[in-house]
Amino acid sequence: MSENSTAENQLGTEPIGRLLVRMSLPMIISFFIQALYNIVDSIFVSRISENALTAVSLAFPMQMAAHAIAVGLSVGLNARVPEAIGAKDEIRANRIAGTAIFLSFVSMLVFMAAGFLFTTAVYKHQTDVAEIIDGGSAYLRILWTVSAGEFFGQLLEKMLLCAGCPLSAMLSQACGAVFNIIFDPLLIFGIGIFPRLGITGAAWATVGGQIAAALLALIMNLKHNHLIHLQPSDFRPDISSCKDVLSVGFPSMVTIGLSSLSNYLINQILLSYSTTATAVYGIWAKLQNFCYMPVFGMNNGMVPILSYNLSAHHPDRVKKTFHMAWVFILLLQVCLMVILECIPASLLSLFNASESMKAIGIQALHICLLSLPFGGMTIIMTTAMQSLRHSHYALIANILRQFINLYFFTALLSALTHDLSIVWRAVPIAELASFITAFLLMRSMFNHLHLSEDDAHRF
């Protein structure tokens, strides 16, 4: 049996529990490591000053704009390539991969130009504190202009997943995270032979880690990927391949892009209270990102299985895969919520929090952490919608979750109460509303896929 057939048979015949663990666990670990270095980055920056932490917090929505495009294109590849392979269409699979790479290259050039032209203006629009403007614009400029590792690393890792090589994808992401964690303090504080770069040192460590991960993923693909064989002609995009990638990837772009916009607008609301409130929200965003990394890891393992088995007409495997992923994420998010609810002061101490920051932050974390189970389940449901050819459902749910609900409830509670302690309640309220919407859309999707009503109630 050929290596191609073996990789395909694993997606179509291996027991679902074992397959989901094998495909997802390495990615969950690597995403955890990735989230850890995002937190470590902020921890080290907080040692510079609270203004430096605020500058990084204000950069986060802008940083996620590039991440949104990179993730969206990689999600499109991750869903459509296994689907083409399941349909025995290798030519289409290669064209989809080549088109995703081309679109990533164009996106990288756009953000490179934005990095040179707009970063200072972005910060001046948000604050008049010179330290925040200077440090933040320099930080963001590096992240945008040196974004090759972000864009190509995401795609190359998803290509490894499509080929049934999750361990290789995990190693490449772990390599980038370890690079960042090691070089963060060296470049921020000027340890040993390294220059003291302050906040820009954190940016250089981040892009260096992304490039290291992308290079290792490239090497792994050349050695282990036996399903995707790219030719120069595959990099010439065509309308059909662009539709294949974007029909699945666009909802993910919208999800993260609207999250960036929502964070930006919420930061403006919080700045009306204090810069400390904005710094606290930045800490929550990093902690939330850390807690959702297992969800994203599970998604990466789940998507190829769902797409392949839908295309190969194995509905029972589709249902069982989704059910197991959904239950696992629910249990994990509840556990994380309970653990973190017990240690908010300790979490804030990691970020060198002042007493005024702790006074705001402890209350904020207690409230915001309640949102984790609802958010985790919603993310799994919307990802399944994308994989199962219901991207329009995912788009609706993501727009509500990432932008409309969160910003609406934050703005509403702020306008009605002018009380910061009440404004934080917008986070769990928005996640609950989004979960209800996604659940109703999911039931409708099951009916469209000719799944029974019992199956819909089961989930």
Please describe what each predicted stretch is.
Residues F44-M64, I96, E131-G135, I199-T200, ...:
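Interfacial/gating helices of multi-pass transporter permease domains
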Residues F32, L36-T54, Y123-A130, L186-L197, ...:
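Helix-terminus/linker motif at the lipid-water interface of multi-pass membrane proteins
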Residues T13, G17-L36, V40, M62-I69, ...:
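Residue-level signal for short hydrophobic patches within transmembrane helices
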Residues S74, N78, L143-C162, A169-A177, ...:
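Short runs within selected transmembrane alpha-helices of multi-pass transporters and secretion channels
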Residues A65-A68, N180-P185, A214-L218, F290-M293, ...:
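Hydrophobic transmembrane alpha-helices of multi-pass small-molecule transporters
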Residues M1-S24, V81-A148, F194-F250, L306-S371, ...:
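Short alpha-helical transmembrane segments in multi-pass integral membrane proteins
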